[in-house]
Amino acid sequence: MSSARFESKILSRAELVAAVAAGRLPRPLVFTNGVFDILHRGHVTYLDQAAQLGATLVVAVNTDESVRRLGKGSDRPLNQVQDRAALLAALGCVDAVTSFHEDTPQELIGELRPDLIVKGGDYDMDTLPETALVKSWGGRAVAIPFDFERSTTALLGKIRQG
């Protein structure tokens, strides 16, 4: 059986950096990142809005090891990085998915040099080191307010309470 078509959007970090450097991904390039452990309506709305800000949306997913370092709980992530990447790649608004093992995506952002970085409305963009980085080459940092207040952590809390 052949792979699902969306799996071609999942790229190694090196493949993604090479594709961007070769101009194979149209600009403006929009970058966002996250854990995306249990994909919910808040995630997909946010990603669709981010995609509308440019020609290409790149999503970087935390590896399982980096999720554990974030302190979200000993049982997190619930879904392995390959599965989280596949679900994101299946979304029509997402053009490319990769993963990163560091605590922050700063190094990857430096390699890709996106035109915009996008985070959810709960981030203060002025305090993020990624903001200064993207601005250093003329890029922008944008916070997208949440239309749907959803949280994987809160959802898991409800499930655990029964």
Curated annotation (Swiss-Prot):
Belongs to the cytidylyltransferase family. It catalyses: D-glycero-beta-D-manno-heptose 1-phosphate + ATP + H(+) = ADP-D-glycero-beta-D-manno-heptose + diphosphate. One of its GO terms (molecular function) is heptose-1-phosphate adenylyltransferase activity. Disulfide bonds: none annotated. It holds the Pfam family CTP_transf_like. One of its GO terms (biological process) is lipopolysaccharide core region biosynthetic process. Pathway: Nucleotide-sugar biosynthesis; ADP-L-glycero-beta-D-manno-heptose biosynthesis; ADP-L-glycero-beta-D-manno-heptose from D-glycero-beta-D-manno-heptose 7-phosphate: step 3/4; Bacterial outer membrane biogenesis; LPS core biosynthesis. Keywords: ATP-binding, Carbohydrate metabolism, Lipopolysaccharide biosynthesis, Nucleotide-binding, Nucleotidyltransferase, Transferase. Catalyzes the ADP transfer from ATP to D-glycero-beta-D-manno-heptose 1-phosphate, yielding ADP-D-glycero-beta-D-manno-heptose. Cannot use GTP, UTP, or CTP as substrate. Is not active against the alpha-anomer substrate. Is also able to catalyze the ADP transfer to beta-glucose 1-phosphate in vitro, yielding ADP-beta-glucose. Its EC number is 2.7.7.70. This is D-beta-D-heptose 1-phosphate adenylyltransferase.
